[in-house]
């Protein structure tokens, strides 16, 4: 069965946060094509402010093939428009970015843009990152000491740190390098999380049925961030993030449209 929907790590995070009641500004590269216009309109219908430089390229697209267990088997991504984003494209939005307390980055951004954001905003802003993939997480290598929050899966953390260690050991290394808070997910083996108060484990109870794994990691991050913004502890935030991830796993879409139901639990 072939299904088309909007996705992308950053976009998924934005939609999740908007559906959880947050006012979000999304600065990204969107093409001036029908897909880009529809994507922008859909987010704006959720009260998201969408800012984008003007591009003639096509909006990014992504094709994923899932196996019988609803796990991703292979994926192909066309992100040329993001890869071509330059620092000068962001300069018109410099003051808008400066007005926010927190900046969330996903590692789909190219190295030049990531380095500029840190050099420009690291002193007075909380910077939070989502690793995205093992081959892109190294883009954050030189900025770990300025990270307020880091989230990845186990494979991505191993690629970042060049260590075949356990999640707990990798968390310890991240904290030693100056990361303030970090979360490493390891599928049904659970979630490791840590901050200045130590490193802890969260047991994940597997769902009996998974509809799609697409977007589950993005929902986990969004749920954790929502709880932290509500001034919950990291332990409470991880538990809430797990609820958000389970919502995504139970949905055929990259973002569960009923994710706000977990606010009632």
Residue ranges and their predicted role:
Residues 17, 153, 217:
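Short, conserved phosphate/pyrophosphate- and ester-handling motifs at nucleotide-, phospho-/glycolipid
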């Amino acid at each position: 069965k072939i299904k088309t929907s909007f996705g992308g790590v950053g976009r998924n995070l934005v939609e999740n946060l908007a559906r959880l009641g947050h006012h979000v500004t999304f600065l990204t590269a969107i093409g001036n094509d029908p897909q880009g216009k529809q994507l922008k309109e859909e987010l704006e219908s959720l009260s998201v402010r969408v800012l984008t430089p003007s591009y003639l390229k096509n909006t990014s697209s992504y094709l994923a093939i899932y196996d019988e267990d609803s796990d991703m088997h292979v994926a192909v991504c066309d992100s040329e428009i993001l890869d071509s984003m330059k620092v000068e494209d962001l300069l018109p939005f410099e003051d808008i970015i400066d007005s926010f307390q927190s900046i969330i980055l996903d590692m789909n951004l190219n190295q030049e843009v990531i380095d500029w954001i840190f050099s420009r905003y690291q002193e007075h802003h909380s910077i939070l990152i989502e690793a995205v993939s093992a081959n892109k997480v190294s883009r954050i290598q030189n900025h770990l000491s300025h990270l307020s929050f880091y989230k990845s899966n186990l494979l991505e953390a191993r690629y970042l740190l060049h260590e075949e260690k356990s999640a707990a050991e990798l968390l310890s290394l991240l904290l030693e390098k100056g990361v303030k808070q970090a979360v490493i997910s390891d599928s049904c083996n659970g979630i490791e999380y840590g901050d200045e108060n130590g490193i802890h484990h969260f047991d994940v109870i597997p769902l009996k049925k998974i509809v799609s794994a697409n977007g589950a990691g993005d929902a986990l991050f969004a749920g954790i961030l929502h709880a932290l913004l509500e001034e919950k502890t990291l332990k409470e935030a991880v538990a809430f993030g797990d609820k958000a991830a389970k919502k995504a796993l139970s949905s055929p879409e990259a973002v569960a449209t009923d994710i706000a139901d977990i606010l009632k639990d």
